[in-house]
Amino acid sequence: MSYSSTETSTYTTIDVEAVMRRITADLVMIAASTGAITESKAREYAHDIELLAKNGYLDYVDVTLISNGVEQKATRFHVNESGELANDRPGDARWPRIQGAYLRIVVNNRSTYDQAARQKLSGKMKISWSPCSDDISHSGLTQSGGREYSSNGYGMQRKDYN
């Protein structure tokens, strides 16, 4: 006798929105604590990230605080559709305020984000995104903790670097 098992994970745009509320809270907290961008600008980034996520194009988002060419702190939000993540509360995203520092926000999209996808989202994005070839491996920082945000089968895992 043989048995089989099928496991599926489904989610809706409502689930993506629920997770994005937590990501937005983190981005706003990072913006407010560093002073590197305004809360309004953080919400514009969050809008675009959510748009990419809702359309299934987003792989991860990398946020880095840079001062004098040196990474000070970073966090990476990686999409996870396994349905196995916890649902933590946003927080622990207060970063230092360093004079002259700036935030680098990089989105990495899935291969499905092709020319047709760009056309589909044309005019809907709030940030003027451009290609980035920076090293975002955070080799000078140490991975330390993070958070998990999920709703049904959709989630994002946050990894922090100090």
UniProtKB/Swiss-Prot annotation:
Which Pfam families does this chain map to? bacHORMA_1 (PF18138)
Keywords from UniProt, A to Z, are:
Antiviral defense
Which InterPro entries is this protein grouped with? Answer: Bact_HORMA_1
Please name the GO terms of the biological process aspect recorded for this protein, alphabetically: defense response to virus
Return the Polar residues bias intervals.
139-154
Q: Where is this region: Disordered?
A: 138-162
Q: How does it assemble?
A: Forms complexes with CdnC with 1:1 and 2:2 stoichimetry, and a 1:1:6 CdnC:Cap7:Cap6 complex.
Family statement drawn from the similarity comment of this UniProt entry: Belongs to the HORMA family. HORMA1 subfamily.
Outline what the protein does: Sensor protein of a CBASS antivirus system. CBASS (cyclic oligonucleotide-based antiphage signaling system) provides immunity against bacteriophage. The CD-NTase protein synthesizes cyclic nucleotides in response to infection; these serve as specific second messenger signals. The signals activate a diverse range of effectors, leading to bacterial cell death and thus abortive phage infection. A type III CBASS system. Expression of this CBASS system (Cap18-Cap6-Cap7-CdnC-CapW-Cap17) in a susceptible E.coli (strain MG1655) confers resistance to bacteriophage P1.
Record-given protein name: CD-NTase-associated protein 7
Protein's organism: Escherichia coli (strain KTE188)
List the gene name.
Answer: cap7
